[in-house]
Structures are given as structure tokens and as C-alpha cells.
Amino acid sequence: MHIRTVGYGHPDAVALDREVQAEYVERYGEGDTTPVDAAQFDPPHGIYLIVYDPDGTPLASGGWRGRDSGEEGYADGDAEVKRMFVVRAARGRGLARLVLAALEDSARAAGRRRMIMETGTRQPEAIGLYTSSGYTPVPKFGVYRFDEGSRCFGKALSGDGGDTGDGRGADRDPGRTRAVGAP
């Protein structure tokens, strides 16, 4: 397995985005209506990653885009996770956790202070991933901030257990490995 940085408009990114949107339709009755501009994922203000198997098949994706304070509830220094997705055939192998760790590392290196994401109650596996990775609930933000089924989480990227926006803070596991399946 290897992780590759690609543009959000890359053909593999587009194909994976179609798959995640189809899954949103299955779970919620519609796709994600959050406005997304491909340029938001261009370094150093964002990144988009794809995990490939040894044969070059795309298995998982995720990106972050820099967000700062404004009317939608963001804070200065936020990195918002978008389009985290693992194809069904590759689920349960730690790929989402691998992508999330790589996104955190990239956002930290870009000077972002907090990683945030929004998910919904119909994605309990996503909520489980984020909470088991040290994310805690934060005030709602973004397009779905008024949706009752929306859940927002955050994690400080400073490495010092700093504030995630809810006053509780979070620590990052410094021993996290980048190899899939490693202990």
C-alpha cells in the first residue's frame, strides 16, 4: 500500500468522489451539498490523498482544506477533513486510520492548528474512527451546522494536547505508524 498526493480533479479522485457521493445517497437520500472547489485541496492550503494497492488500484481517499474564522463557525487555523472514503472491498484494513494520520501530519506541517470534520449519525463507523483517534465533539460548523443529524469533531494538531474548541483538548499518538497492518 502507498499513499499518493493527487489533485482533487485527478481521475482517481473523481471516481472515488462519485463512490462516496453514491454512498451518501444510500445513507441520507442525497449527496453532500457542501461547496467544494478543487483548488482548496492544493498545497500548501490543503491536500488530497489516495491510498493505492500494489497493483495501482485506488482503495481510499481523503483531503483537508484550510479554513479560517467566518460565518460558518470555523476558527482560524482549522483544517477541515473532506471526502474520507474507503471502497467497500477494502474496509476493515486500517486504511481510513492511515489516511487520517497522513492528513493530520500534512495539516500540522502546513501550520494548521486544529483538524475538524463533520459527519452524520448515519455514519457510525466514521464517528467511531474519529473518537477513537482522539477527536472530541466541537460546536457545529459548515453547511450542515443546523442539521440535527450532523456531528462535528475536532482535534488539536499542536501535539501539546491543546484546545480543540471545546476546552477539553486532545493528544496525538506519536507512535502511530504509516504502514498498513503494522502493530
Where are these regions (language model features)?
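Conserved GNAT acetyl-CoA-binding A-motif
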Residues: 100, 107-119
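Active-site acidic-Proline motif in GNAT/NAT acetyltransferases
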Residues: 87-89, 93, 121
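Accessory recognition modules or surfaces
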Residues: 97, 149-158
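Conserved amphipathic alpha-helical interaction elements at protein-protein interfaces in regulatory
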Residues: 92, 105-109, 132, 136
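Conserved catalytic-core motifs of GNAT/GCN5-like acyltransferases
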Residues: 8, 116-121, 127, 131-132, ...
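Residues forming the Rossmann-fold NAD(P)(H) cofactor-binding site
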Residues: 93, 97, 101
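Acetyl-CoA-dependent GNAT
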Residues: 1-82, 87-88, 100-102, 106, ...
